[in-house]
Amino acid sequence: MNYPHPIIAREGWPFIAIAAVVALLIHAVGGFGFAWPFWLLLVFVVQFFRDPQRPIPAQPNAVLCPADGRIVAVETAQDPYANREALKISVFMNVFNVHSQRSPVDGAISKVEYFPGAFLNAAIDKASTENERNAVVIQTASGKTVTSVQIAGLIARRILCYVRAGEPLSRGQRYGFIRFGSRVDVYLPLGSRAKVSIGEKVYASSTILAELEQ
């Protein structure tokens, strides 16, 4: 699958432009001795908004990781967006991770639901139910329901979602972005087999999060 997005996310272009202009102006006025912190800031902003292509596993029943980060939860929990008990796997993204979100499975979107909320530390459990969040519920061709939830964090105050109910999604397809540290919860049917453990570092699209029961 071709990756139809620039390696530096469009969401970051305005921030990069501002950081570059500030660094150039200060460099022109005061030289590198005064400007180096602003050049360093520019490097940080560029790396934050990187959005590289990732290999996508071909395994048909695989649930792919929707985001870069670290696993903070693997547990049975209530999926409030699909009204069921489910296997919940949570990925926490710090400010150094790639912050685009990608579809964990192939399927059709049955629901997209946004909830305003707080901005607690996204690494803690209650962020799942109390923070600002956006849920995308996906139905696979085999009738499985997979819910992917973007959750804002302590610093992240902007959730971007580019898909709507009724649209198709392909595994690994980019569908959203959260700025400056956040979390993604994935709810899977009971019987799915988790392939990751708490504390494990994971990568969007290339890490297999779980396997759906066949």
From Swiss-Prot:
PANTHER family xrefs: ARCHAETIDYLSERINE DECARBOXYLASE PROENZYME-RELATED
Sequence positions bearing Pyruvic acid (Ser):
S182
* Protein's UniProt name: Phosphatidylserine decarboxylase proenzyme
What Gene Ontology molecular-function terms does this entry list? phosphatidylserine decarboxylase activity
Tell me which species this is from: Burkholderia cenocepacia (strain HI2424)
An example of a Pfam family matching this protein is PS_Dcarbxylase
Q: A GO BP term, please?
A: phosphatidylethanolamine biosynthetic process
Q: Entry cofactor note text?
A: Binds 1 pyruvoyl group covalently per subunit.
Does Zinc appear among the keywords? no
Reactions it catalyzes: a 1,2-diacyl-sn-glycero-3-phospho-L-serine + H(+) = a 1,2-diacyl-sn-glycero-3-phosphoethanolamine + CO2
Pathway(s) annotated for this protein in UniProt: Phospholipid metabolism; phosphatidylethanolamine biosynthesis; phosphatidylethanolamine from CDP-diacylglycerol: step 2/2
Write the Enzyme Commission number(s) for this entry. 4.1.1.65
Q: Which InterPro entries match?
A: PS_Dcarbxylase, PSD-A
Q: Where in the cell is it found?
A: Cell membrane
Q: Which cysteines are joined by disulfide bonds?
A: none
Q: What gene is it encoded by?
A: psd
Task: Name the catalytic site residues.
Answer: S182
Q: Where is this site: Cleavage (non-hydrolytic)?
A: G181, S182
On subunit structure and binding partners, the annotation says: Heterodimer of a large membrane-associated beta subunit and a small pyruvoyl-containing alpha subunit.
UniProt modification remark: Is synthesized initially as an inactive proenzyme. Formation of the active enzyme involves a self-maturation process in which the active site pyruvoyl group is generated from an internal serine residue via an autocatalytic post-translational modification. Two non-identical subunits are generated from the proenzyme in this reaction, and the pyruvate is formed at the N-terminus of the alpha chain, which is derived from the carboxyl end of the proenzyme.
Record function comment: Catalyzes the formation of phosphatidylethanolamine (PtdEtn) from phosphatidylserine (PtdSer).
Q: In the UniProt record, which is one GO cellular component term? A: plasma membrane
> Which cofactor does this sequence's record say it needs?
pyruvate
